[in-house]
Amino acid sequence: MAENDIDRDAIKDEVDQIFGNRPKHEGPELYQVNDQSSIKHVIGVISGKGGVGKSLVTGILAIELQRAGYKVAILDGDITGPSIPKMFGLSGLHVFGQGDKIIPAQSKGGIKIMSTNLVLENENDPVLWRGPMLMGALKQFYEDTLWGDIDYLLVDMPPGTGDVALTVFQSLPIEGVVIVSSPQDLVQVIVGKAVKMATMMNVPVLGVVENMSYMECPECGHKLEPFGPSHLQEIVDEFKVADLGRIPIDPKVAASCDAGTFESELPEGLIPKAVSAVEA
């Protein structure tokens, strides 16, 4: 059969039959909250790598916004490595359903929280899910949770630029992101990837917070830099992003995260510029 004799209509019919005549998706799916919830602002907290304190910054922002009188919720988007529930004293607790919806957990201060650890039978069980299941969990957490009326939903995103991070950017109405870094030599390359990803997704970068920036001697007040000198100003200059502050290494804060007393023991005013950037 000559090329011009190919029955393209027959081929199309056969393909449609095989795939059930599925509709063609022109772009990524946009997630919608349920009709019993209203969220005014969605802010992402991201990092180019793990272990830099992204969840810590998410928690600080949530608590400071709550203290300022806003209604705040956290969606723990780090599906395979969630840490938010433990920080807020919710270890061992489980969310429950109401019809086909989910009632989120709530911290003592009133911050609503949805996380994988709140649905696992044992919070120490590994989450061995592939991409589609991770995306499905994120969609269900956002759409099916009864958030109520929320001023700020903070999304604690997984580190890096993988599937879940991409889905958050494409499918959630993210208004801006706070990037978390640490004072290591490779940080500029890592932060650069996060900045470029946000730019490619047309999501504004609110600025960069540097965690574990220094230690302050309790006796003399001298600042030590155990992880090397700060690179925050270099990042600000290179990528034209805002300096949202430096967080010191504080053993008391680390201990409160482990003990679940982070919310009540957090010192005020750690990153005021970051809070102001989110409010703006």
Model segments located where?
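C-terminal lobe/tail of nucleotide-utilizing enzymes
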Residues: 1-30, 195-280
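Walker A/P-loop phosphate-binding motif and the immediately C-terminal alpha-helix
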Residues: 41-79, 195, 201
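Phosphate-binding loop that captures ATP/GTP phosphates
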Residues: 71-123, 135
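Phosphate-binding P-loop
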Residues: 34-40
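Conserved Switch II/interswitch segment of TRAFAC-class P-loop GTPases
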Residues: 148-155, 161, 173-194
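Glycine-rich phosphate-binding loops of nucleotide-dependent enzymes
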Residues: 114, 138, 157, 170, ...
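Residue-level signature of catalytic and energy-coupling elements of molecular machines
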Residues: 39, 50, 76, 84, ...
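Phosphate-binding/switch loop-helix module in NTP-utilizing enzymes
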Residues: 120-168
